[in-house]
UniProtKB/Swiss-Prot annotation:
The keyword DNA repair does not apply. One of its GO terms (molecular function) is toxin activity. The cysteine framework is XI (C-C-CC-CC-C-C). Expressed by the venom duct. Its main location: secreted. This is Conotoxin Fi11.11. Keywords: Amidation, Cleavage on pair of basic residues, Disulfide bond, Secreted, Toxin. It comes from the Eukaryota. Residues 35-44 form a propeptide. The keyword Amino-acid biosynthesis does not apply. InterPro entries: Conotoxin-I_CS (IPR013141), Conotoxin_I2 (IPR020242). Disulfide bonds join C1-C15, C8-C20, C14-C24, C19-C28.
Length: 44
């Protein structure tokens, strides 16, 4: 299985974690705020 912080796809299985935004995260619900900066890149 994949460890936390490693890239993953919707089909890959993480070690007791979920695949959030293409990365294994043990706190998927709290990680929503980290996905917000993706929009800031477009503003540059």
């Amino acid at each position: 299985c994949h460890h936390e912080g490693l890239p993953c796809t919707s089909g890959d299985g993480c070690c007791g974690m979920e695949c959030c935004g293409g990365v294994c995260s043990s706190h998927c619900g709290n990680g929503r705020r980290r996905q917000v900066p993706l929009k800031s890149f477009g503003q540059r």
